[in-house]
């Protein structure tokens, strides 16, 4: 988010050199929350035709994939939904674009199996800035 955190391409490229870091796609420009009937992040709008939505999401995500190829010499296999808003439609489109993993903002623990489908719609916990590791995990029930 431009108001509180960002990296430049050089910094991201440096991170790509680590086997511990995976750089993901978070859309190029679908980070708005436009009220009750508007678009919420990368999600389909109420009443929007699937074909129209598919074009919007595909064009946007592809633009960032192309930028990643240009600056990082690789694209992403991972997609994190802005604001965590997702739908069956978005999952279908992203699978079609070659993403292997999607991350929501739903809180919870994931059960990872040998079935690749379990990597779509993954839950996660948002760790607040400055939260102590031990206290954070204790708070979510992991000790």
Indicate where each model-derived feature is located.
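C-terminal active-site subregion of NodB/CE4 polysaccharide deacetylases
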Residues: 14-18, 22, 28-143
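Active-site glycine- and acidic-residue-rich loops that bind
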Residues: 1-9
């Amino acid at each position: 988010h431009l108001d509180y955190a960002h990296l430049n391409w050089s910094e991201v490229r440096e991170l790509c050199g680590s086997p511990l870091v995976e750089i993901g796609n978070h859309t190029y420009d679908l980070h708005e929350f436009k009220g009750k009937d508007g678009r919420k992040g990368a999600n389909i709008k109420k009443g929007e035709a699937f074909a129209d939505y598919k074009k919007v999401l595909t064009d946007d995500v592809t633009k960032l994939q192309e930028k990643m190829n240009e600056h990082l010499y690789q694209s992403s296999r991972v997609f994190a939904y802005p604001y965590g808003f997702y739908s069956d439609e978005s999952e279908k489109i992203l699978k079609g674009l070659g993403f292997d993993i999607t991350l929501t903002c739903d809180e919870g623990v994931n059960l990872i199996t040998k079935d690749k489908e379990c990597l779509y719609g993954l839950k996660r916990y948002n760790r607040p800035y400055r939260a102590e590791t031990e206290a954070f995990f204790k708070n979510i029930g992991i000790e």
